[in-house]
Amino acid sequence: MAAKEVKFSVEAREKMLRGVDILANAVKVTLGPKGRNVVIDKSFGAPRITKDGVSVAKEIELEDKFENMGAQMVREVASKTSDIAGDGTTTATVLAQAIVKEGAKAVTSGMNPMDLKRGIDLAVSAIVEELKANARKISNNAEIAQVGTISANGDAEIGRFLAEAVQKVGNDGVITVEEAKTAETELEVVEGMQFDRGYLSPYFVTNADKMRVEFEDPYILIHEKKLSNLQSMLPILEAVVQSGKPLLIIAEDVEGEALATLVVNKLRGGLKIAAVKAPGFGDRRKAMLEDIAILTAGTVISEDLGIKLENVTLNMLGRAKKITVEKENTTIIDGVGSKEEISGRIAQIKAQIEETTSDYDREKLQERLAKLAGGVAVIRVGGSTEVEVKEKKDRVDDALHATRAAVEEGILPGGGVALLRAVKALDNIKTANDDQRVGVEIVRRALEAPARQIAENAGAEGSVVVGKLREKSDFSYGWNAQTGEFGDLYAQGVIDPAKVVRTALQDASSIAGLLVTTEAMIAEKPKKDAPPAMPAGAGMDF
């Protein structure tokens, strides 16, 4: 086992603080609408330019092991906030730095670290309740656009795209962000249920110009197994032909004689028909077929349920207003399934999302939920260069998470003002002793840090701005760093999601509390390199 180096009390905290400061100082320059960029060197390709706090934090690794421990703990704050709220990583880092700095001073002056931590925890709980009490529910699309704009560093175009996407697919819908092939940013919305399987034969195409199958008011046969001969299907095919409506077959596969017969019948004009493979694999395929059945009020033809193909009747088939099948996608629009059944299925999937521990499963369940609940929106981010596209995509990702969080828990005034105003909740806290009271005061001072930093990044004097904000008691009165004006931040569209502000504070205080109560640090001793061997014969007389 390698030898370890151990540092105690003041020396340990000094090293740790230096690491915290290096990381936090690099991250906090990105805060606010006038935050600066950070350029990150890549081992290959162009450097990456970003204003995303967590991206900066993840790149920092320090040479000194003890300093690095401090930096990594604060990096954990940014990552945790990013995972839960998707935004607010820079605010969390600034808060953590402020609490650790003040806390370390108090411990060095002889206060009890555990009581300080209790005081910090009491203060944070009071602030969180105050934030929740003052959060406003989002009431219209303009507010969603404002949240998106603020989180995308003042880019109104991104805010507009996000508001449009949320409006079209709802809050349960999936919104994905991709890099565009062009310089323009665009939004594409797929309404209805779409899955990534196309027609099994191009002969099924009804619209030759666009190379796709378009059916109005079709029947849908949902079959779990392969179809290789049509004998057992003849009764249902005849019933569909008599009804005069088109038929879409969704099955594990349609092959050989069955596919050939369907194509021949289609070409001779007697049958409006198309066949596609079922989406997904294994158990997920069963679940997705069940989703399609509920959406279209059909039945999955499955041997598990004891239903044979020859016994299928028209009322077991699904129905929809329109179906489009392309080479690689199938879209079912306006299935006739009952609202209650669809809502029940959505609730079931939401429960599974809560229970699952696998990120992959959660992502797939979210996709299924979106397909049932409303649709999928894709924002394609464009730019002139690859570096610009990547930087913009970072901002769109942040803004997307922020808008989701805003719809979930409501909004608060932005610019660090919500935290500054919530300070009044600390006046009534009862503490057991003076050290706990100091812990509460540490949080009181730390809550100014984000507003101060936003002002400094915008070229103003942080103390002056905070002083002016303190003169007014109105919760939404603040300073707009973009315009340099004081006023009602709700009216000016400077708003933050309550979930982001709350998560940033809770994560920052949690890690900062651990750092303040640290008394010893252990790391491996750096290995001393052995001196190079002397060359043979050097300095020898023969």
Curated annotation (Swiss-Prot):
The record lists the catalysed reaction(s) as: ATP + H2O + a folded polypeptide = ADP + phosphate + an unfolded polypeptide
Please provide the record's keywords in A-Z order.
ATP-binding, Chaperone, Cytoplasm, Isomerase, Nucleotide-binding, Plasmid
Pfam families, from UniProt?
Answer: Cpn60_TCP1
Instruction: List, in alphabetical order, the GO biological process terms annotated in this UniProt record.
Output: protein refolding
Question: What's the Enzyme Commission number for this chain?
Answer: 5.6.1.7
Instruction: Enumerate the InterPro entries for this protein.
Output: Chaperonin_Cpn60_CS (IPR018370), Cpn60/GroEL (IPR001844), Cpn60/GroEL/TCP-1 (IPR002423), GroEL-like_apical_dom_sf (IPR027409), GROEL-like_equatorial_sf (IPR027413), TCP-1-like_intermed_sf (IPR027410)
Just give the chief location class: cytoplasm
Q: Mind telling me which HAMAP family this protein's record contains?
A: CH60
Protein name according to UniProt: Chaperonin GroEL 4
Q: Which organism is it from?
A: Rhizobium etli (strain ATCC 51251 / DSM 11541 / JCM 21823 / NBRC 15573 / CFN 42)
Organism placement in taxonomy: Bacteria, Pseudomonadati, Pseudomonadota, Alphaproteobacteria, Hyphomicrobiales
- The protein's gene is named groEL4
